[in-house]
């Protein structure tokens, strides 16, 4: 396949994702029409929408890389690739709405805060991601995933002491879970 044909195929895939969503998102939305009070389906929809946002973002980066022509840069000049990820924001925002619905229907549903943190991290909203991971750890102080991703958020925020603290917690939790 030529680079032009590949770029065209990626563009079509991105357009389809924006118009209908992924097959899994479509399936889950149909399921919610039948069972709008099913917290598990809402949770799965949130997961699928977050994944669709990441998938779209990956396609956008790949397309931008294909269209990037570093040979046009001056020698020694750094070139950056501009990627418009604005369309995937809709997936992330809809994922947050789905997770909020889970909290309304089943406040005790395990993992919601951690998943909300992942979405906020994808949105690059680090303060909200931090808040979600801290809530997840309040709910379950042995939540390895929340501890690990909280360490990443703190690293991205430049809070190295906190990043190390939560990375150590994640490592300890991982070792404990591996031993069991």
For each of these PLM feature ranges, what is it?
Residues 34, 105, 139, 172-173:
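Structural marker of alpha-solenoid helical repeat scaffolds
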Residues 5-48:
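N-terminal segments that cap or nucleate solenoid repeat domains
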Residues 1-5, 148-180:
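Terminal, low-structured helical/coil segments at or just beyond the last alpha-helical repeat
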Residues 16-30, 53-73, 83-101, 122-135, ...:
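Structural signature of tandem alpha-helical TPR/SEL1-like repeats
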């Amino acid at each position: 396949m030529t680079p032009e044909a590949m770029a065209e195929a990626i563009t079509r895939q991105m357009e389809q994702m924006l118009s209908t969503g992924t097959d899994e998102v479509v399936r889950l939305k149909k399921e919610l029409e039948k069972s709008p009070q099913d917290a598990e389906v809402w949770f799965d929809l949130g997961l699928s929408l977050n994944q669709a946002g990441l998938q779209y973002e990956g396609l956008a980066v790949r397309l931008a890389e294909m269209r990037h022509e570093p040979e046009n840069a001056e020698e020694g000049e750094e070139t950056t690739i501009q990627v418009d990820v604005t369309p995937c924001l809709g997936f992330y925002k809809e994922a947050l709405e789905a997770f909020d619905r889970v909290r309304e229907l089943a406040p005790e549903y395990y993992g919601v805060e951690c998943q909300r943190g992942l979405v906020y991290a994808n949105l690059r909203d680090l303060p909200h991601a931090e808040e979600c991971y801290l809530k997840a750890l309040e709910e379950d102080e042995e939540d390895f995933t929340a501890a690990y991703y909280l360490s990443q958020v703190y690293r991205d925020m430049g809070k190295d002491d906190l990043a190390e603290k939560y990375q150590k917690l994640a490592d300890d939790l991982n070792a404990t879970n591996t031993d069991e």
